């Protein structure tokens, strides 16, 4: 009864509401139903890889599952006699967006907005059983390893989970050519919330970003950009980071003095930028202290004249209120070359990367009285 069924739905709708307004709706979803043994495929293949092909038969003539004192697990038994599990997983993704041209204000100007939903959920149930393996001896008796157990009557819930993310962004763009001058600008505001079962509150992100690109006569290119990003992982006053970048390029092959036929394209470029990282692997809200309680069975103290036992508390994590974004600075310079009618391409890059506010795990000595999860910053 091993099977896998998958049901998909997908829809993409694009509509030109007016000459200047475009809207779209994208929908994708799927349902997956799986029936499988209680033994995982990795466990089955691990056993297969350790058993010699001639170590034992699969089963004996009387149907008993074969095994030995050395190989007490049988791949056939793992597949057919450990019970079963049923999994159902669901995925739904929806995105709606609208784009409005504002040529009535100035040519090349436009605004846009997008909302998105991305959700997954899963539910698994199963029943368990077990099997014994038998080793035939010279006197036609069996040595038995393990125990046969019938399929359980009760169905067990193996897992039940869900998570979903809501995202929104809105912004504007400007794209226009004035003779030999090309100008492109873009800016947006964005925010997202990730809701995970068992975690409260949601993971929240918010920020703005933008860029401005200028090109003169398809020879000289410059670009500046920025991101002002925020995360609820850090304390107020440290939640936002500013990450700028600047880049420039000289396309020498478009110069009038460049007439080398062997080289079709030649560009020199350089850039500097900063990138932020807030996914550091620490527990949530590491800027806050974390206290845990314990009762009489695991600690506490006697207080008062009545010798009454009181529960206790201990600090399980030392906070670091100064935690903020990890930032990586990058310097890059390079050259791009195309030869022989673009049949050969050569790219050379040199770069330097430096990370500041590097987030590291801080170890504490035993006399501190806590294992701690304090996060230290380093350059």
Question: Can you say where each PLM-predicted feature lies in the sequence?
Answer:
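Extracellular/periplasmic, surface-exposed regions of secreted and cell-surface proteins
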Residues: 12-21, 25-31, 35, 40, ...
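GHKL/Bergerat-fold ATPase module in large chromosome/replication-associated machines
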Residues: 41, 52-61
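Surface-exposed beta-strand-turn/loop segments characteristic
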Residues: 1-3
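Active-site-proximal polar cores
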Residues: 133-134
């Amino acid at each position: 009864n091993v099977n896998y069924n998958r049901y998909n739905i997908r829809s993409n709708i694009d509509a030109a509401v007016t000459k200047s307004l475009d809207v779209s709706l994208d929908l994708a979803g799927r349902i997956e139903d799986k029936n499988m043994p209680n033994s995982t495929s990795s466990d089955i293949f691990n056993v297969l890889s350790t058993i010699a092909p001639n170590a034992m038969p699969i089963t004996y003539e009387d149907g008993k599952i074969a095994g030995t004192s050395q190989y007490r697990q049988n791949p056939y038994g793992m597949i057919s006699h450990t019970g079963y599990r049923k999994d159902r997983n669901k995925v739904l993704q929806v995105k709606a967006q609208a784009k409005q041209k504002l040529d009535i204000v100035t040519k090349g100007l436009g605004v846009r907005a997008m909302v998105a939903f991305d959700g997954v959920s899963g539910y698994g149930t199963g029943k368990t059983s077990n099997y014994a393996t038998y080793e035939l001896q010279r006197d036609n008796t069996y040595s038995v390893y393990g125990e046969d157990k019938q399929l359980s009557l009760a169905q067990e819930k193996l897992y039940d989970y869900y998570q979903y993310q809501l995202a929104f962004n809105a912004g504007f763009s400007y794209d226009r050519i004035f003779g030999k001058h090309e100008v492109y600008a873009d800016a947006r505001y964005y925010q997202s919330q990730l809701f995970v079962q068992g975690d409260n509150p949601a993971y929240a992100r918010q920020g703005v970003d933008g860029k401005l690109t200028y090109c003169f006569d398809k020879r000289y290119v410059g670009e500046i950009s920025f991101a002002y990003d925020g995360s609820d992982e850090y304390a107020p006053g440290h939640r936002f980071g500013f990450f700028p970048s600047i880049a420039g390029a000289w396309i020498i092959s478009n110069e009038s003095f460049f007439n080398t036929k062997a080289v079709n394209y030649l560009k020199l470029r350089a850039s500097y930028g900063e990138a932020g990282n807030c996914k550091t692997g620490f527990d949530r809200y590491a800027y806050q202290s974390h206290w845990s309680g314990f009762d009489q069975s695991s600690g506490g103290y006697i207080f008062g004249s009545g010798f009454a036992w009181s529960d206790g508390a201990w600090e399980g994590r030392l906070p670091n209120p100064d935690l903020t974004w990890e930032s990586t600075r990058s310097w890059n310079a390079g050259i791009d070359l195309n030869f022989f009618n673009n049949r050969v391409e050569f790219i050379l890059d040199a770069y330097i990367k430096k990370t500041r506010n590097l987030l590291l795990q801080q170890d504490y000595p035993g006399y501190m009285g806590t294992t701690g999860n304090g996060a230290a910053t380093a350059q």
